[in-house]
Amino acid sequence: MSQQEIEVILSRHLAEYLAMPIFIVNPDGDLIFYNEPAEAILGTRYSETGSMPASEWATKFQPTDHEGKTLPPEDLPLVIAITQRHPAHKVFWIRGMDGNMREIEVTALPLIGQADRFLGGIALFWERSTK
């Protein structure tokens, strides 16, 4: 495992203490962490999935639009945040590893460190209310 930048270490540490689901990726888009609140929505624990490449996580949860059409990875907010290096937001559906479909809202940001170092991206997301 390569050494992580201090900003990434601190982001992960913060995520561990927040009630908001958070998903963190490195500059290549590889998953490096998601917190316990995210586990409930994704339907699996981080300790069971571990890190995974963007090509895997971007399709593993079967993201679809409101019409049920598969969303390509390049349309996902976190992929936009790391490839275009600007914030992105979207509402879409995923299938958790527990088999349940969930409508989620995602806001993703690029992680930019001191001296403009690109460190990856972070997504905050939540399940939309069905009320």
Enumerate the language-model features and the residues they cover.
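Conserved hydrophobic beta-strand signature of PAS-family and PAS-like sensory domains
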Residues: 31-32
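PAS-family sensory/regulatory domains
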Residues: 47-68
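PAS/PAS-like sensory domains
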Residues: 70-74, 81-90
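PAS-family sensory domains
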Residues: 117-128
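N-terminal capping loop/helix in small sensory signaling domains highlighted by a polar->aromatic N-x2-3-F motif
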Residues: 35-39
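Output-coupling edge of small sensory domains
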Residues: 109-111
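Sensory modules in modular signal-transduction proteins
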Residues: 2-27
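PAS/PAC sensory module
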Residues: 75, 89-93, 100-106, 122
